[in-house]
A protein has these predicted regions:
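N-terminal Rossmann NAD(P)H-binding glycine-rich loop of SDR-like oxidoreductase domains
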Residues: 3-23
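SDR active-site strand-loop-helix element
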Residues: 6, 30, 62-66, 103-109, ...
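Rossmann-fold cofactor-recognition segment
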Residues: 32-48
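NAD(P)H-binding glycine-rich loop region in Rossmannoid oxidoreductase-like domains
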Residues: 44-84
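Catalytic helix-loop patch of NAD(P)-dependent Rossmann-fold dehydrogenases
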Residues: 76, 83, 87-91, 98, ...
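NAD(P)-dependent short-chain dehydrogenase/reductase
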Residues: 141-191, 197-198, 204-205
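Mid/C-terminal beta-alpha module of Rossmann-like enzyme folds, strongest
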Residues: 186, 202, 209-254, 259
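Conserved C-terminal active-site "lid" loop/helix of NAD(P)H-dependent oxidoreductases
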Residues: 224-230, 247-291
Length: 292
């Protein structure tokens, strides 16, 4: 297939585009950031720009990764969050609708409130706790209301990108242990890590099935940030570093976080398409391949 990808320069895009290419798909990579070779400029917030590019490329599929994923920035700048995550998604969706193109929308387990004790599945009702989750959920609703052929795939705590792109928890912890021997990490929020490489492989398999719909795709198992930090220290071979568990109140942040973002890939399992491994094995591979 000829696949146009938005947000290609980010954590996920840097793993997904090569995965698609290795499977024989022709990838047209786009992003606001064109520092990497082979990436075409695209700001999804501008409808005419999106529509013109889709008409010009005539892809078989558009994979929409472009998003504002900084949860606190979304809370502090809600107009920016909705303009990027909701209106940007509407622009891509309308362009796909006009050309009858299949669309893939990457969403988040953060669309749930986080108060249930069982892992969330595709059949649970969303109720976002923060602006980021609301803006992504609005994107889901737009895709579902305007298209018949789509994949909406929710990811969990994303890990990947290496030193160049990983500005999230894992990258921060690895950078901290270069300077500190005592760290603190939150233990009262639980989630499902999602390795970009594994997610990309699973997504590539899914889009070749024609099983359109809404899916969860996270690595197997659940953990707290504290659990992740302990594993990072172990995998980095730093027995001299210790991490102390703290409550989330220790780190006051603008945006509320869900108590639980535990996810299960229920529909993928029912379809026999869930090949996501344990999060600890995925984390070890990520650290060994990108941080050592």
């Amino acid at each position: 297939m000829k696949i146009l990808v938005t947000g290609s320069a980010g954590m996920l895009g840097s793993a997904l585009c090569p995965t698609l290419a290795r499977r024989g798909h022709k990838v047209i990579a786009t992003d606001l950031n064109t520092i990497d070779a082979g990436i075409e400029y695209l700001d999804v917030r501008g409808y005419e720009q999106v529509d013109d590019l889709v008409k010009k490329i005539k892809p078989d599929m558009v994979m929409h990764l472009a998003a504002e994923t900084d949860v606190d920035k979304c809370e502090l700048e809600p107009d920016h969050a909705f303009q990027t995550n909701s209106i940007g998604t509407q622009n891509v969706t309308l362009a796909c609708q006009k050309q009858n193109i299949v669309m893939v929308y990457i969403s988040t387990i953060g669309v749930f409130y986080g108060d249930q004790f069982e892992p969330y599945s595709e059949f649970d009702n969303p109720n976002p706790i923060n602006i980021y989750g609301r803006s992504k959920l609005e994107g889901e609703k737009i895709v579902q209301s305007l298209l018949q052929r789509y994949y909406i795939v929710r990811a969990g705590w994303m890990m990947g990108g290496g030193p160049k792109r990983d500005k999230k928890f894992i990258g921060k912890i690895i950078n901290q242990i270069k300077e500190k021997t005592i760290l603190k990490a939150v233990h009262d929020k639980i989630g499902s890590p999602t390795y970009t490489v594994d997610f990309s492989k699973c997504l590539t398999n899914l889009i070749e099935t024609g099983y359109y719909g809404l899916y969860h795709c996270t690595n197997e198992g659940y953990c707290s940030r504290f659990d992740v930090a302990k594993k990072i220290i172990d995998f980095m071979g730093r027995p001299d570093v210790t991490v102390e568990p703290v409550n989330s109140a220790y780190f006051p942040l603008p945006a509320a976080r869900a108590r639980s973002e535990m996810s299960r890939n229920y529909k993928l399992k029912l379809l026999g398409k869930d090949a996501m491994r344990n999060w600890e094995d995925a984390l070890k591979e990520y650290i060994d391949s990108c941080w050592k």
